Amino acid sequence: MIKTRIEEVQLQFLTGNTELTHLKVSNDQLIVTTQRTIYRINLQDPAIVNHFDCPLSKELETIMNVHVSPMGSVILIRTNFGRYMLLKDGEFTQLNKIKNLDLSSLHWINETTFLMGIKKTPKLYRVELTGKDITTKLWYENKKLSGGIDGIAYWEGSLLLTIKDNILYWRDVTNMKFPLVLPDESEQFERLKHHAIKKFDSYNGLFAWVTSNGIVFGDLKEKQMEKDPASNNFGKFLSSSKVLLNFELPDYQNDKDHLIKDIVLTAFHILLLRKNTVTMVSQLNNDVVFHETIPRHQLTGSNTDSNEKFLGLVRDSVKETFWCFSNINVFEIIIENEPNSVWNLLVRDNKFDKALSLKGLTVREIESVKLSKAMYLFHTAKDFHSAAQTLGSMKDLSHFGEIALNFLQIKDYNDLNVILIKQLDNVPWKSTQVVLSSWIIWNFMKQLNDIELKINTTKPASTDEDNLLNWNLNLKEKSNELTKFLESHLEKLDNETVYQIMSKQNRQNELLIFASLINDMKFLLSFWIDQGNWYESLKILLTINNHDLVYKYSLILLLNSPEATVSTWMKIKDLDPNKLIPTILKFFTNWQNNSKLITNISEYPENYSLTYLKWCVREVPKMCNPIVYNSILYMMITDPRNDMILENDIIKFMKSNENKYDLNFQLRLSLKFKKTKTSIFLLTRLNLFEDAIDLALKNNLIDDCKVIVNDEILIEDYKLRKRLWLKIAKHLLLSMKDIDIKQLIRTILNDSNEILTIKDLLPFFNEYTTIANLKEELIKFLENHNMKMNEISEDIINSKNLKVEINTEISKFNEIYRILEPGKSCDECGKFLQIKKFIVFPCGHCFHWNCIIRVILNSNDYNLRQKTENFLKAKSKHNLNDLENIIVEKCGLCSDININKIDQPISIDETELAKWNE
């Protein structure tokens, strides 16, 4: 319920018997005036009071009227001498251009523009403040009416004026020519017989006008309710205005103590001041919601019962606060919970949007307003789309089933979707989101199917072309609408449910759209493969780079689009070719079967599986297991084309990929499919040289035989090479006819590199071979044999001489030896000889290795010393034999290396000498 109370405001700056003349409040700026002074208080900081002494010319000149702009930055002052002044930024400015205009009413349009009504003459001016200057424009003048303009209301182009007992209304003056002439509407009421301080007020498009019989009030914002000139309601704005009759007011008596002194509008109520009583009446039902009398106060030092006179009511249109003031006091009228008290009345009057715009409503109240609005739009206004928009914004789902049923009964799936989508955006529960989203998808499918049915049943006649075009446009729009919904609500959808709904409705395009949006590449891939669209399938494979899917669909793609499939495989990183071998072999079998039908070898199709595996071997050899190499060779060997180029390619591949394939398996294949040269190559790799020679000879491949016997492996195996050459020679000599036998023999002997001789060939000559054919080779053989016998004889003689020399040396060495007695010491250091490595010279002197080296380094044999030093500096100690050869050249005692010690004195051991003297 609405709560209203009146609180007195303490104005500490007023002292003594100072009386107030005017009160204005704008944007929390409270303006109080006395007869000559203006006080300004910021209600946000009321302790600071700014006062301005009005520059009046004479003592009798006083402030007569005060008008404050909506934001409180401009104060317009009129004195009793007819002068106008502007107070802005603390400075007063004279407005001489309007000094001759007798102001009766004023309405601010904005902070610098206002409409000004003239007293006695019905004229309306538009005044614009430009700095310290003003510009005026005559908006209205009526020479037929008498009296001035009492009230002005203006809202977004709508204008309302009151002139004595007349009220004039213009629906929109924005594009009209000024000054205005005839109004769109006008009414005449009984003139107010008594004088009121203010008998008209306007606020945010609302207006209220005090007449003799009561208060006429309305709302300029309702001007757009009826725009059709042909309608019966067009031009009935004034007649639809409401009236609050005087007798509806409490304590009404037609005397001066109960007459209306001032009127102020709130958003939904009318505040009235009658003497010292404030009454508040609802604009919606004319009910009195507040009625209170303010106690009067006495002036200081006055002997009368009361000197307080209530002057008027004031509204702060920006902050929506309300005030009442007398000549000595200011009161604030505090209104609380105004929206909560009127929302149900607005709903009763079908003013739902206005009710929803109220501040402070509870969630339950808002939901109730929305439901009432939706039911009115659905059942009364038949505006199903607007009803759906309203219902969709509701959070209360208790009536949802009934609402949905209403739309289903009229088969309005489009507006039902509006509700469902809005509800989907609001509900936080996942389960509810799944239900709503699935329902929405089903509705979309139903709509799309219905549109397609109409398209299919519309005859393609010229008369139906427009309808057909419209249905196609509707189909496209609905499809776009579905796509937008899916894009914006993906996280609220259950993918499997959506798939099921679309699949059962056979909506393939929508399935593709949805799968693309959720990036379900598996579904898209499966779909395109089912449709046989290999291009799209491969494009998806390349995009997702999923190896498992590549392996899964490899066979069907390779069989139907081999070139593109292989190209795609090559682009996919880290693809394992070993896992594709089963697919490749199946493709190769199919390729073989197709190739059998082709008679012209040049028309053979390309084996793309072989192309791919060769690419793998070349580009990613580390990923290729032996099965890859075996598969390549298998396809090459079993190729129905049997030409030398193919065999050369096989052998070339084998040579470049040694030890990476199964030799035995490939040999069996080669023999089975009669790839002779390949078989020969494999036999040699298996060291089956005799079998290789036999196979080559069987096929009369003499050059291949020669290559075999010259293999590097056979270089050390003379006997095997000879056996192989004997096979070749036998074949040549026994099988060749009508040839030059003499030349053949020479060729065999030369090619064998003297492995064979004419003697080896003799068993292979037939009985018809003449000696003339053998003469030259026999002579050469005998000459060579004679030379070899001579060489052998010389070798025997040399061997005998060598034996004699060896025996002589052995005898000499048997005489050269020395016997060392136990305890033998080094001739240099005197220590036991056996504790270190030592050398014994033929002269019998013995030295440790290190001792003899020291002797050499201290000797005067510069040649020997230099050799020793160079060896030690070079640190070539790994070859101690070289050092030994150096140090054993001369004895350290009895050779010339010790000659530099001749001049040195002999050292005598005194202890030893004493022993000899005993």
UniProtKB/Swiss-Prot annotation:
Chain ranges of zinc fingers (RING-type): 826-851
Name under which the protein is recorded: Vacuolar membrane protein PEP3
Keyword Phosphoprotein in record: yes
Alphabetized Pfam families for the sequence: Pep3_Vps18
Segments annotated as CHCR repeats: 585-741
Coiled coil: none
SUPFAM superfamilies, sorted: Calcium-dependent phosphotriesterase, RING/U-box
Subcellular location per the Swiss-Prot or TrEMBL entry: Vacuole membrane
GO cellular component: CORVET complex; cytosol; early endosome membrane; endosome; fungal-type vacuole membrane; HOPS complex
Record GO terms (molecular function): protein-macromolecule adaptor activity; zinc ion binding
Regions that span the bilayer: none
Keywords annotated in UniProt: Membrane, Metal-binding, Phosphoprotein, Protein transport, Transport, Vacuole, Zinc, Zinc-finger
Gene, per the UniProt record: PEP3
Function: Required for vacuolar biogenesis and for trafficking of hydrolase precursors to the vacuole. Mediates transport at the vacuolar membrane where it may be responsible for tethering transport vesicles on the target membranes. Acts as a component of the HOPS complex that acts during the docking stage of vacuole fusion. HOPS is an effector for the vacuolar Rab GTPase YPT7 and is required for vacuolar SNARE complex assembly. It remains bound to SNARE complexes after vacuole fusion.
Assembly information from the UniProt record: Component of the HOPS complex which is composed of PEP5, VPS16, PEP3, VPS33, VPS39 and VPS41. HOPS associates with phosphoinositides and the PX domain of VAM7. Interacts with PEP5, PEP7 and VAM7.
UniProt similarity note: Belongs to the VPS18 family.
Residues with Phosphoserine modification: S907
Top-rank taxon, per record: Eukaryota
Single biological process term from Gene Ontology: late endosome to vacuole transport
Species, as recorded: Saccharomyces cerevisiae (strain ATCC 204508 / S288c)
Membrane topology of this protein: Peripheral membrane protein
Other information: Present with 2020 molecules/cell in log phase SD medium.
